[in-house]
């Protein structure tokens, strides 16, 4: 992925400096310029460190969102970093939330194949 580094408290990297929204948006922008047809995600980690992070990722060239579709009962077992967003929502709730947020920025979520 192309998200910011977000430390997890139970890893050897727990005290490492977290990545920033700005660094991530610059990288997304550069990738979009270099690879116009690439599938570039606006990651959950970007949305975790900034409330509008995923939306800003799209505004800087990202074109993929990766919702958490794992059953709520097992999501804690896949906790890559602390304070991850959307861990308490059911898959359908997450999809509805993503749709509303995308529409607010003039985007539409599709579930088609992403290749060209």
Q: How should these model regions be labeled?
A:
Residues 1-116:
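Auxiliary Fe-S-binding modules of radical SAM enzymes
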């Amino acid at each position: 992925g192309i998200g910011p580094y977000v430390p997890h408290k139970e890893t050897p990297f727990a005290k490492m400096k977290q990545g920033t929204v700005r660094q991530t948006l610059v990288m997304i922008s550069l990738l979009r310029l270099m690879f116009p047809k690439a599938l570039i995600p606006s990651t959950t980690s970007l949305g975790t460190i900034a409330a509008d992070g995923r939306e800003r990722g799209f505004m800087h060239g990202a074109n993929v969102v990766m919702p958490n579709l794992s059953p709520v009962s097992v999501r804690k077992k896949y906790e890559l970093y602390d304070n991850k967003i959307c861990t308490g929502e059911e898959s359908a709730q997450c999809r509805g939330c993503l749709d509303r947020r995308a529409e607010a920025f003039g985007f539409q979520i599709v579930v088609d194949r992403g290749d060209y």
